Amino acid sequence: NYEFARTAIDMALGRGGDQAVVKNGEKIQYYGGKSQQLEKTTRVKARVKAHALRELLETKDRLLIMGHKIGDIDSFGSAIGVYRIAAALNKKASIVINDVTSSVRPMKERFDDSSDYPDDLFLTGKEAAELVDANTALVVVDVNRPSYTEEPELLKLVKTIIVIDHHRQSSEIIQNA
């Protein structure tokens, strides 16, 4: 029961926090609030963005993915997720990572040791820069400030840049994204 209650609170907060959530069997009902369409709208926005991402990636031959400096699990996991999207589209993709932090190291080593992933899954910023051409796209995950990215120089080299981030934007933004 505690888990159901905790989930209901999270759902109410995700929909604006101004309503009650009641689970009756398998059915979930929402009472009160002015944000009842938020969940549907959010799903529609996510679907539209996913479709746009797919269309953009289909026009490129190579995909470079990078997160922020001093990478954490959030950044690393996001990069792996985008890599899997690229793999599903049969696109060549690599994750840019210069310094592996102690929190990321165990996960990265599992990918390094896996025969399911290519040897060039992880590249340094310098290695990635050498691969950039007109058919390269750069996906920046978990960061929206150029100075915080793993390899800011790539932002100058790549013409097609996509930013996927959940943080608030500051005055410092990635140009041409």
Mark where each language-model region is.
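Catalytic/regulatory signature loops of cyclic-dinucleotide turnover enzymes
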Residues: 3-29
